[in-house]
């Protein structure tokens, strides 16, 4: 199974919590004003993140179809099940055909059920790591994403699936 989703990343991401000595206020710089947003798309298998890709700004159906055809499909194996939410850009013409043309099946999650998509947990960890990196330019953000994508161990990815209720036997 491969769970597909996208998440936003911004050049103004900063840690939300921190430590300071007792009696002292924690002070940190937080960028205000102009920042750039990127969209990170990836798939989650039980053994790691696959087909990671970054887009400048938000994506639409055309960009998502290009991701499916050019990035995801080459990683698919016959018999794979691709699972994604019901975002309108995920249902554009050509997405199902491209996935099924690779010998995989496409399933959509029920509406309003992010808890059934284990990649959400991976994205939560990814965003925490990105906040710690404090990338302030698009280039630095994209490099950080590239550096962090391989940081997800197979056991950790399997636990994300297990936590979302997906079980399998070896």
Task: Annotate each predicted stretch with a short phrase.
Residues 1-170:
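Short functional hotspots at interaction and active-site rims
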């Amino acid at each position: 199974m491969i769970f597909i989703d996208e998440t936003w990343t911004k050049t103004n991401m900063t840690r939300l919590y921190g430590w300071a000595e007792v009696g002292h206020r924690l002070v940190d710089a937080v960028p205000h004003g102009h920042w750039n947003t990127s969209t990170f798309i990836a798939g989650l298998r039980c053994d790691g993140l696959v087909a990671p890709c970054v887009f400048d700004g938000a994506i639409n159906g055309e960009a998502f179809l290009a991701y499916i055809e050019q990035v995801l499909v080459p990683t698919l194996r016959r018999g794979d099940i691709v699972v994604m939410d019901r975002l309108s850009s995920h249902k554009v013409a050509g997405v199902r055909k491209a996935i099924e043309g690779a010998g995989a099946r496409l399933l959509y999650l029920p509406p309003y059920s992010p808890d059934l998509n284990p990649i959400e947990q991976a994205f939560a960890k990814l965003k925490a790591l990105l906040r710690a990196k404090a990338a302030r330019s698009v280039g630095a953000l994209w490099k950080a994403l590239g550096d962090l994508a391989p940081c997800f161990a197979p056991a950790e990815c399997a636990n994300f699936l297990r936590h979302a209720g997906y079980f399998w036997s070896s």
